A protein has these predicted regions:
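Carbohydrate-interacting regions of secretory-pathway proteins
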Residues: 21-235
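Bacterial Sec-dependent N-terminal signal peptides
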Residues: 1-28
Length: 235
């Protein structure tokens, strides 16, 4: 009896462990805020189109940090293990002087893609003032990169200070928020969106923005960037 009890208990513990692991790798319940970053590890993330150890990203004082490096030494963009369709995503971020990074969503992995931006729209994060190259409005902080520019409500904090951002994607309706203000709003896949895609930067990327479900990506652009309090709610 005791032997059977121990065997049953051991089996149950294994099942519980497996269930816990599966729950961490599945889409969370609708309407519930879930942490994408636990403040102490890279659990739940992997390198885009990669397996194994994530390079060039680290944890500093509870923040997820892209360490920044020369172009040929990038650790690469990182993506969530879980794919999302309709969601509200919020996070805090800051960059160093001349820094550049971004958050992408509905990212698709596969041999045909070399980078998340080939499929995933991007919330741009950049040093609008001191970036070494001239920036167009569609390249500046808060923009739906190369598609929709931020409005005049945009107020970005100085380099080195934390900002709060949010993306809402709900059945094609998209909003970008920055420090409490809605700065971008558009409808994905409508005639206006299709025209902008076909005539702009993404005309040579046929799969850009078309996925209705995909991974969340944090960009390694060779500059130091800091993220914390990354949360998502499925809608």
């Amino acid at each position: 009896m005791k032997r059977n009890f121990l065997k049953t208990t051991a089996t149950l513990l294994v099942v519980i462990a497996c269930v816990s692991f599966v729950n961490n790798e599945t889409v969370p319940q609708k309407g519930k805020w879930v942490k994408l970053f636990d403040g102490k590890s890279l659990k739940g993330w992997h390198g885009f189109n990669k397996t194994g150890i994530i390079k060039n990203w680290d944890i500093e004082d509870g923040a997820l940090v892209c360490l920044g490096a020369a172009k040929d030494a990038h650790g690469g963009d990182i993506v969530t293990n879980v794919a999302y369709d309709n969601f509200e995503l919020k996070w805090e971020w800051k960059i160093d002087k001349q820094g550049n990074s971004g958050v992408m969503y509905h990212v698709v992995e596969g041999k045909k893609y070399k980078s998340p931006y080939e499929t995933g729209p991007e919330y741009q994060m950049i040093d609008d003032i001191d970036f070494p190259e001239k920036l167009e409005d569609w390249q500046k902080t808060g923009a739906d990169y190369a598609m929709n520019i931020a409005n005049d409500k945009k107020k970005v904090n100085p380099v080195g200070e934390w900002n709060t951002s949010k993306i809402i994607f709900n059945k094609g309706h998209v909003e970008h928020w920055l420090n409490g203000e809605k700065i971008v709003s558009f409808k994905a896949w409508d005639a206006k969106w299709m025209k902008e895609k076909q005539e702009g930067k993404w005309k040579d990327y046929p799969d850009y923005g078309l996925a209705k479900k995909g991974l969340i990506a944090l960009q390694d652009h060779g500059n130091k960037a800091y993220y914390k309090n990354i949360m998502i709610k499925v809608l």
